[in-house]
């Protein structure tokens, strides 16, 4: 069965990657591409926009206009836009794959309430490698526990607007849950000045922004005499695109619920 996929934010860096990823995937077809109502790209062919040749899918400025033409929406935009798109999808019974990060607490609560009636796969990172890292982090933290200091360092391109990255925060949550802590209670975001000795049982975060770094993440488990590091380095956004399309095809026909890439990959 072919999954009809819509991509929103079609003119953005990730939108173009997603369009290409859909075109390369078996069992998937791009049937809609959406941009802001004021975008100069409206009417352009989505395939030509992504640099892969004509697909016969024009970019439109209103999701509701094409909602009957797709099964699953892939949304890697911004919280406000994702919330608006969620309302349209929920009303029409369409599934969503969401890679948007940077939600405030209120925005996340509103999103969760909006999508209770549809299947949603939401993840901070759709890379297969990163999701394997989540599994490895759970194992490492469960074994090493309170015998180590835990630090998370991430690096991204200069244009990324949220910090730490959603992936870094997800890694922190995996580690915190594995050792029986609440990340909100133990996270330390950056250090400056006379900080004093490191508090045990905390999880530190460090952020780097610059250049065209797609995404680097390293979690260090530091003990006296040794350290264990689990790292992932993305060299292309296509790894995220392939994962998102895989999630979209997996989501077709699933009951209304909240899923993530651990479900898609069978890592639960």
Curated annotation (Swiss-Prot):
Reaction equation(s) it catalyzes: (S)-2,3,4,5-tetrahydrodipicolinate + NAD(+) + H2O = (2S,4S)-4-hydroxy-2,3,4,5-tetrahydrodipicolinate + NADH + H(+); (S)-2,3,4,5-tetrahydrodipicolinate + NADP(+) + H2O = (2S,4S)-4-hydroxy-2,3,4,5-tetrahydrodipicolinate + NADPH + H(+)
GO biological process: diaminopimelate biosynthetic process; lysine biosynthetic process via diaminopimelate
Primary residence: cytoplasm
A GO cellular component annotation in the UniProt record: cytosol
Keywords from the UniProt entry: Amino-acid biosynthesis, Cytoplasm, Diaminopimelate biosynthesis, Lysine biosynthesis, NAD, NADP, Oxidoreductase
Protein's cellular compartments: Cytoplasm
Active site: 156, 160
Group of enzyme by EC: oxidoreductase
Residues that coordinate or bind NADP(+): 36
InterPro entries, per the entry: DapB_C, DapB_N, DapB_N_CS, DHDPR_bac, NAD(P)-bd_dom_sf
EC number(s) stated in the UniProt entry for this protein: 1.17.1.8
Protein name as catalogued: 4-hydroxy-tetrahydrodipicolinate reductase
Gene giving rise to this polypeptide: dapB
């Amino acid at each position: 069965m072919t999954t009809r996929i819509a991509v929103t934010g079609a003119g953005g860096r990730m939108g173009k990657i997603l369009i290409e990823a859909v075109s390369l995937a078996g069992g998937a077809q791009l049937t809609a591409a959406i941009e802001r109502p004021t975008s100069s790209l409206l009417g352009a062919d989505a395939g030509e926009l992504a640099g892969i040749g004509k697909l016969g899918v024009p970019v439109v400025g209103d999701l509701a206009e094409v909602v009957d033409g797709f099964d699953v929406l892939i949304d890697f935009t911004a919280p406000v836009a994702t919330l608006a798109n969620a309302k349209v999808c929920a009303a029409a019974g369409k599934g969503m794959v969401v890679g948007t990060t940077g939600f405030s607490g209120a925005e996340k609560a509103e999103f969760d309430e909006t999508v209770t009636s549809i299947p949603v796969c939401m993840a901070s990172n759709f890379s297969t490698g990163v999701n394997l890292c989540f599994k490895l982090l759970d194992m490492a933290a469960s074994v090493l526990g309170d015998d180590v200091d835990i630090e998370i360092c991430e690096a991204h391109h200069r244009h990324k607007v949220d910090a730490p990255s959603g992936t870094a925060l997800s890694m922190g949550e995996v580690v915190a849950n594995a050792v029986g802590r609440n990340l909100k209670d133990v996270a330390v975001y950056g250090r400056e000045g006379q900080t004093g000795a490191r508090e045990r049982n905390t999880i530190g975060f460090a952020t780097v922004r610059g250049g065209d770094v797609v995404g680097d993440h390293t979690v260090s488990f530091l003990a006296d005499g040794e350290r264990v590091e689990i790292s992932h380095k993305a060299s292309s956004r296509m790894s995220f695109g392939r994962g998102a399309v895989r999630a979209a095809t997996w989501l077709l026909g699933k009951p209304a619920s909240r899923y993530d890439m651990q479900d898609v990959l069978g890592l639960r």
